[in-house]
Swiss-Prot record:
GO terms for biological process: translation. InterPro entries: Ribosomal_uS8, Ribosomal_uS8_sf. Pfam families: Ribosomal_S8 (PF00410). One of its GO terms (molecular function) is structural constituent of ribosome. SUPFAM superfamilies: Ribosomal protein S8 (SSF56047). The gene is rps8. It is found in: Plastid, Chloroplast. GO terms for cellular component: chloroplast; ribonucleoprotein complex; ribosome. This is Small ribosomal subunit protein uS8c. Belongs to the universal ribosomal protein uS8 family. Keywords: Chloroplast, Plastid, Ribonucleoprotein, Ribosomal protein, RNA-binding, rRNA-binding. Part of the 30S ribosomal subunit. Its main location: plastid.
Amino acid sequence: MVNDCISDLLTRIRNANLVKKEKLIIPNTRVSRNICALLEKEGFIDSCQVNSTEELALQLKYKGRERKPCITNLRRISKPGLRIYASYKNIPKILNGMGVVFVSTSQGLMTDREARYRKLGGEIVCSVW
């Protein structure tokens, strides 16, 4: 049993990218589905499908002949031992807006751009670039 499903998800994606795997199976949780949906919407992965009540299947995305991963770095910001919260004015920009920060708000999980547009603050979950 994993205590932190977000860190587990990010680590599995990072490790699969390092060995250039096409598909990845992860545990099916609501948070995992939301993060994968945002990764798909932002263009970091090809697809996310529900295999069963316990599994999600991710199709990872690579660029060019060298098959460079679309995800350069995944970083967990708010951890179970140290939660990080920010108002919409203080949500950090990653690589001057080239990267994406996922924010857990009262309206659900969303990207930093969407949270700033809706003027919602919340917990800074992770960053992707």
